[in-house]
């Protein structure tokens, strides 16, 4: 069950980072380049390490759908896309609230594409 806790923790970190970006995007927090960089770095790092947290035998006890193990290459490619898109954001860091909003649309679409297929509904 260690894998389940680890991957859920990583996913919560990504969620927290998306929340930090959303607060800037919505104008609830002022634009802060360091906060944006930190949030997107967490998303990039965790997305790249994420597929390793799903070894055979860790299929139960979480919101991870069995489809992950049935279509592992697709799952890995979706995680890789999130990591690559986060790296693109880091390479050209958004300079203002509008840039953060645009970055969130891309990253959020990546999150949704994976969750739709690979996360069980609660």
From Swiss-Prot:
One of its GO terms (biological process) is electron transport chain. The keyword Cytoplasm does not apply. Keywords: Electron transport, Heme, Iron, Metal-binding, Transport. Heme binds at residues 11, 111, 114-115. GO terms for molecular function: electron transfer activity; heme binding; iron ion binding. Binds 1 heme c group covalently per subunit. The keyword Ribosomal protein does not apply. Disulfide bonds: none annotated. Low-spin monoheme cytochrome c. This is Cytochrome c-556.
């Amino acid at each position: 069950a260690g894998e389940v806790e680890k991957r859920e923790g990583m996913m919560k970190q990504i969620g927290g980072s998306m929340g930090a970006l959303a607060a800037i995007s919505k104008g609830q927090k002022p634009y802060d380049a360091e906060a944006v960089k930190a949030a997107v770095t967490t998303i990039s790092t965790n997305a790249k390490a994420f597929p390793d947290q799903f070894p055979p035998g860790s299929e139960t006890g979480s919101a991870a759908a069995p489809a992950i193990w049935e279509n592992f290459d697709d799952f890995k490619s979706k995680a890789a896309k999130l990591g690559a898109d986060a790296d693109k954001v880091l390479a050209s860091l958004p300079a203002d609230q509008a840039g953060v909003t645009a970055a969130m649309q891309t990253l959020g679409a990546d999150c949704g594409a994976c969750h739709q297929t690979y996360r069980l509904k609660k």
